[in-house]
Amino acid sequence: MELQFLGTGAGQPAKQRNVSSLALKLLDEINEVWMFDCGEGTQRQILETTIKPRKIRKIFITHLHGDHIFGLPGFLSSRSFQASEEQTDLDIYGPIGIKTYVLTSLKVSGARVPYQIHFHEFDDKSLGKIMETDKFEVYAERLAHTIFCMGYRVVQKDLEGTLDAEALKAAGVPFGPLFGKIKNGQDVELEDGRLICAKDYISAPKKGKIITIIGDTRKTSASVKLAKDADVLVHESTYGKGDERIARNHGHSTNMQAAQIAHEAGAKRLLLNHVSARFLGRDCRQMEKDAATIFENVKMVQDLEEVII
């Protein structure tokens, strides 16, 4: 499981940072990539990675400001250029209005998309758990931006314990159907009368990962709720220390407020994202150091950076 940041800037493209988009790579888990936001130029950024467009099966939009959605019609159109046998359907999750925006853009431009797009739109009344599969759950809450904006919490379900095959062989259990029964938690009796207890040969379930992605927002309790005990918290950091007033006026957060959220939520790691173009390399390093005075395990991410979860 990995995160790759396709765009880490705020508002408009800059020389060092493209606008918002990140990919959650779940290739080992479900052979899919989930994308969060799709700002202008996202498909160009994807060309700099190993991500295959057909693997992107779900797109989660935080809100409808242009720096988070202007790349979506182009990406969807280009995705249709795959060979016919590689076409895969796509789900798009986001605020009410995302369906109209996408379909209107495709219609006006004459784009022909040969795969199915399934839209899932949300407002205040439909938040909470918005998606569930056999391996993952996704939750959404409203944040505190200048327009309706959602934060996402991706929860991997606990992984089953693994079977200790070597210990079973050492115990004289013949390889075959009995292994399957024991793996399913079933006790078995051997021909010599010995009872093999499944729990003695299966490791404890492994807790799944939690990834929280916070879109544009002022400091809010909803962010703490979404980030509770998260393995990774991706939080916007449009402004720096001392910029609290301007951040609030524009519906954004500072690096220090992001660190406070991570601390209050008990997150394990904080990745600062969505950085104003006025902050250059030295400034970003200082923002990281300042945030570390509140939450130690913090990093300011860069475009195309990969983070293993």
Curated annotation (Swiss-Prot):
<dbReference type="InterPro" id="IPR036866">
    <property type="entry name" value="RibonucZ/Hydroxyglut_hydro"/>
</dbReference>
<feature type="active site" description="Proton acceptor">
    <location>
        <position position="67"/>
    </location>
</feature>
<dbReference type="InterPro" id="IPR013471">
    <property type="entry name" value="RNase_Z/BN"/>
</dbReference>
<keyword id="KW-0540">Nuclease</keyword>
<keyword id="KW-0479">Metal-binding</keyword>
<dbReference type="Pfam" id="PF00753">
    <property type="entry name" value="Lactamase_B"/>
</dbReference>
<feature type="binding site">
    <location>
        <position position="63"/>
    </location>
    <ligand>
        <name>Zn(2+) 1</name>
    </ligand>
</feature>
<feature type="binding site">
    <location>
        <position position="68"/>
    </location>
    <ligand>
        <name>Zn(2+) 2</name>
    </ligand>
</feature>
<feature type="binding site">
    <location>
        <position position="274"/>
    </location>
    <ligand>
        <name>Zn(2+) 2</name>
    </ligand>
</feature>
<dbReference type="GO" id="GO:0008270">
    <property type="term" value="F:zinc ion binding"/>
</dbReference>
<keyword id="KW-0378">Hydrolase</keyword>
<comment type="subunit">
    <text>Homodimer.</text>
</comment>
<protein>
    <recommendedName>
        <fullName>Ribonuclease Z</fullName>
        <ecNumber>3.1.26.11</ecNumber>
    </recommendedName>
</protein>
<feature type="binding site">
    <location>
        <position position="145"/>
    </location>
    <ligand>
        <name>Zn(2+) 1</name>
    </ligand>
</feature>
<dbReference type="GO" id="GO:0042781">
    <property type="term" value="F:3'-tRNA processing endoribonuclease activity"/>
</dbReference>
<keyword id="KW-0862">Zinc</keyword>
<feature type="binding site">
    <location>
        <position position="67"/>
    </location>
    <ligand>
        <name>Zn(2+) 2</name>
    </ligand>
</feature>
<feature type="binding site">
    <location>
        <position position="216"/>
    </location>
    <ligand>
        <name>Zn(2+) 1</name>
    </ligand>
</feature>
<comment type="function">
    <text>Zinc phosphodiesterase, which displays some tRNA 3'-processing endonuclease activity. Probably involved in tRNA maturation, by removing a 3'-trailer from precursor tRNA.</text>
</comment>
<dbReference type="InterPro" id="IPR001279">
    <property type="entry name" value="Metallo-B-lactamas"/>
</dbReference>
<keyword id="KW-0255">Endonuclease</keyword>
<keyword id="KW-0819">tRNA processing</keyword>
<comment type="similarity">
    <text>Belongs to the RNase Z family.</text>
</comment>
<feature type="binding site">
    <location>
        <position position="216"/>
    </location>
    <ligand>
        <name>Zn(2+) 2</name>
    </ligand>
</feature>
<feature type="binding site">
    <location>
        <position position="65"/>
    </location>
    <ligand>
        <name>Zn(2+) 1</name>
    </ligand>
</feature>
